[in-house]
Amino acid sequence: MAFADRLLAAWYAGHPALALLRPLEALYRRVVTRKRARFLRGDSASYRAPVPVIVVGNITVGGTGKTPMILWLIEHCRRQGLKVGVVSRGYGAKPPQLPWRVQADQAADQAGDEPLLIVQRTGVPLMIDPDRSRAVQALLASELLDLILCDDGMQHYRLARDLELVLIDAARGLGNGRCLPAGPLREPADRLREADAVLFNGASEDRTDGFGFCLQPSALVNVRTGERRALDHFPAGQRLHAVAGIGNPQRFFNTLLGLNWQPVPHPFADHAQFSARSLAFSPPLPLVMTEKDAVKCRAFAADDWWYLAVEAQPTPAFSAWFDNQLQRLLRKP
């Protein structure tokens, strides 16, 4: 197990040795708290877009189902006739310039795996740039949009936001409740009180402290050809290699177990780069990966490589709440 994986496991298990990192945690908390306070006071400038900006992010390190939720938000807004754009940091991307407009036929190392997935699934206009405010301005210069979704960026206060949606893994929660590096929190837990909504991935019902949503498997898709198959393409008990280069690989492996398959788990670091050699496992079995990983593997995928398509399913209460927020944000003065 890599050091990063061991540290992540310790954060969520509450390992006592993490107490040694509390002096560094105190320094980190002071820095992030002061940074946010400067923007709240107006001492540091932020850019406010002429259209509503909705930030979808988290305060923890590790996967929370952010990309599937963004896909749901895009389609939900489109069904109401809204023109939606997306901005993202483009973690790991190496574009020729910044800001960079992501196109569906670009390579993942140029566009970033998550932005490329979003564009390939939805065709939405999407701009990447670590400076989210610059990305928003570039997007609005080329598109007439009704609103913008910011993929992550909770801590990017240079971009003013009209709505904050925070995602949390319902099973792991906030771990030991400590900030980096003694715990998984990017900001202190009381930051959640300032968010407009908290959504718990893996909660089939709403909670007193937020809404619930689940990731529902919908199909198997061939990585090389794009052919879609029903989930019963593999019979119960099917052994297969399972690849996950995401923030919480175990959640993916558990999903495969829940489909009555027998995965041989191969966890990789989040945003890992793959090659045919790195995925040449023994014994020869069908291989199933996440959709985020699949966008990086199409060029060298074998015939029996598949990705599991999943769809975010928030509760009806969240859908109703979100519709009310859209009406508020888009109400003409």
From Swiss-Prot:
InterPro entries registered for this protein in UniProt: LpxK (IPR003758), P-loop_NTPase (IPR027417)
The organism's place on the tree of life at top rank: Bacteria
EC number: 2.7.1.130
Pfam families found in the cross-reference section: LpxK (PF02606)
CC terms in the record's Gene Ontology section: plasma membrane
Keyword ATP-binding: yes
Swiss-Prot/TrEMBL catalytic activity: a lipid A disaccharide + ATP = a lipid IVA + ADP + H(+)
Keywords: ATP-binding, Kinase, Lipid A biosynthesis, Lipid biosynthesis, Lipid metabolism, Nucleotide-binding, Transferase
Binding site for ATP: T60, V61, G62, G63, T64, G65, K66, T67
GO biological process: lipid A biosynthetic process; lipopolysaccharide core region biosynthetic process
Pathway the protein acts in: Glycolipid biosynthesis; lipid IV(A) biosynthesis; lipid IV(A) from (3R)-3-hydroxytetradecanoyl-[acyl-carrier-protein] and UDP-N-acetyl-alpha-D-glucosamine: step 6/6
GO molecular function: ATP binding; tetraacyldisaccharide 4'-kinase activity
Family of the protein in this entry: Belongs to the LpxK family.
Summary of the function given for this chain in its UniProt record: Transfers the gamma-phosphate of ATP to the 4'-position of a tetraacyldisaccharide 1-phosphate intermediate (termed DS-1-P) to form tetraacyldisaccharide 1,4'-bis-phosphate (lipid IVA).
Protein's UniProt name: Tetraacyldisaccharide 4'-kinase
